[in-house]
Amino acid sequence: MTFGKGKKPLLIISGLGDGLATVKGMAQMLALAYRGFTTAYQVYVFSRINELPENYTTRDMATDIAEAMDVLGLKRIAVLGISQGGMLAQWFAADFPERVEKLILTVTTAKLNNLGRERITRWLELSQTGAYKELIFDIVSHSYTAKSFGKFKYLYRIMGIFGRIKDKQRIAIQAISCLRHDSLAVLEKSKCPTLIIRAEEDDVLGVGASLELHHHIKDSQLTILLDCGHALYEQHKDFQKRVLVFLES
């Protein structure tokens, strides 16, 4: 999927939510959500491939991104990876360094800590029992700050009533790939300018994940956005501004 009026390419790699719904048919919504990028950039948003094989890893997913770029004729691109998308972006920058102009790793980790493992395992269990309402409620309750969650919790309860899990295997394979993700040994291979963005109140990955990335990626920049949770890319009004400043620097 692509949108935007600019000439410079920007790739956005989405998170684990791709296991529940791909980006197909969501161009207008995504263009609105990421409107801060659409003037200067031609934005590409990739879902995972349609048929996910067993034992499909975050590294495999990164290789698929390189192949998709070949099809589109994209040689070199700025990459914004969010949550699980950041895991893919780490492998992409390590395995295909010549293709990454700049890298933004947002609310992501090189390896899940105990908190992240607890969250993903819980979501995996709920997804496999078909408990869509409980799954959505649990994701949202841990992704937003208590203040933000309080405003929208009834809306998400209603959404949970009418939604359903379309493909249990798809979400399971992606969740398991998160649980197995470990890129610590290759982070030093990433040579491009890198911005790491952390949420002050991240209740999915905690605060240590971004610090670990910053420690292992040489000359990386670390930005902490205050008063927001894991869903900072939706919550924080300065998120896109910070990314643009980095991209244009």
Residue ranges with predicted function:
Residues D60-I77:
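Conserved acidic catalytic loop of the alpha/beta-hydrolase fold
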Residues C228-Q240:
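Catalytic histidine-centered segment of alpha/beta-hydrolase-like enzymes
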Residues N114-R117, E134-L179, V186:
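Conserved alpha/beta-hydrolase catalytic His-Asp/Glu region
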